[in-house]
């Protein structure tokens, strides 16, 4: 979060040949160019969803205060990948469920140990921000049970709708970080601008406040 207020740099989609601004509006204000796909559920016998063993505490164990969104500082998390190779950089995205505030961390690779280490660094920097995080059940998050200072839960495998808030924000980020494009050249400043475009947007679901405005209210109270 930029304590100096909204970033004044102009934003362009990541598929442009340069990170430099060419338009007077941010890409987040344009209609989303996302392909909507139906949720694909994997079914076993009897039509029930087929689930692998969870990596740790299941989403089913989350307390009710997380489900109703009335209590802030509970998050959903995942990775946004450019090139799908573990030795390639990616983005770890964390979305606060009540305010929709987004934290984005560039990671040099998405090995489980790397994801755990950099998330722990973020929690250690902002210990008051994080009560819980719910991740998907991907192998990248296998070491998250080692996290200290924050409760970790795991959604069921093949169930992205269980982290719908984070999935929605990841869709917005995809306007700046398209699939198949390496993130090696994406600078910290560019990632911050893309994140600010989401956090500074007035949203109907937030009564036309911004995610950053609401998040600041909660952490300062």
Please name every model-derived segment.
Residues 100-105, 154, 179:
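Short small-residue beta-strand/loop micro-motif enriched in glycine and branched aliphatics
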Residues 128-143, 158:
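Acidic/histidine-rich, metal-coordinating catalytic segments
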Residues 6-67:
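Basic, flexible linker segments flanking DNA-binding modules
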Residues 1, 14, 78, 100, ...:
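Mobile genetic element proteins and their domesticated derivatives, centered on retroelements
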Residues 72-83:
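Two-metal-ion RNase H-like nuclease active-site motif
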């Amino acid at each position: 979060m930029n304590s100096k207020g909204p970033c004044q740099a102009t934003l362009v989609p990541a598929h442009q040949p340069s990170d430099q601004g060419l338009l007077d509006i941010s890409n987040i204000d344009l209609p989303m160019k996302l392909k909507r796909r139906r949720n694909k559920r994997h079914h076993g016998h009897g039509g029930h969803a087929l689930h692998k063993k969870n990596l740790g505490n299941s989403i089913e164990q989350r307390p009710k205060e997380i489900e109703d969104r009335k209590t802030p500082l509970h998050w959903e998390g995942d990775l946004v990948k450019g090139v799908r190779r573990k030795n390639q950089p990616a983005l770890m995205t964390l979305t606060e469920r009540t305010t929709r505030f987004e934290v984005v961390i560039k990671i040099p690779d998405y090995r489980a140990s790397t994801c755990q280490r950099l998330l722990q660094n973020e929690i250690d920097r902002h210990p008051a921000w994080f009560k819980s995080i719910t991740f998907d059940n991907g192998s990248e998050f296998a070491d998250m049970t080692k996290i200290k200072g924050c409760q970790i839960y795991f959604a069921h495998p093949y169930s992205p709708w269980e982290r719908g808030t984070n999935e929605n924000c990841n869709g917005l980020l995809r306007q700046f970080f398209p699939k198949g494009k390496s993130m090696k050249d994406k600078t910290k400043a560019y990632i911050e601008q893309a994140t600010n475009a989401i956090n500074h947007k007035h949203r109907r679901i937030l009564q036309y406040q911004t995610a950053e405005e609401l998040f600041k209210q909660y952490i300062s109270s």
